Amino acid sequence: VTRVFPEFSNLRVYAGGGGSVPFAPGAPAGPMRFVDLLTHMSGLTYGLQNRTNIDAVYREHNFDFARRHLDSDAFVAKLAALPLEFQPGTRWNYSVATDVLGIAVERISGQRLGDYFAEHIFGPLGMVDTAFGTTEANHAR
């Protein structure tokens, strides 16, 4: 994934710390692959899981809903600055990997995700009422 996300070139795995204690620099993470993102085996997490110190930092930064207040580049940069919960490809954990995959589509295509889906998926399938949100004109429906 580092060709699309150079920010992920120097990821590290959690080794301790959190809360009032700084994170201990962990081992360098192995390469994260797109299949790891697709199968929730990337080492990323969700804050809502409330299990680990990494989850707590995700909650602190509101990562579960970060796309409402961070642009794609800022979101990826903040994720890249945090340690992973585990080495990519070694464990399974629901995570913001789906958000990262959406950003990959944006970076590769040069389009916003909703525009890409409308042009390449929804439009060709005749799904004219399908989108990531509603327009003001459709609120009354």
Language model region names:
Residues 3-141:
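Short, surface-exposed loop or secondary-structure junction motifs
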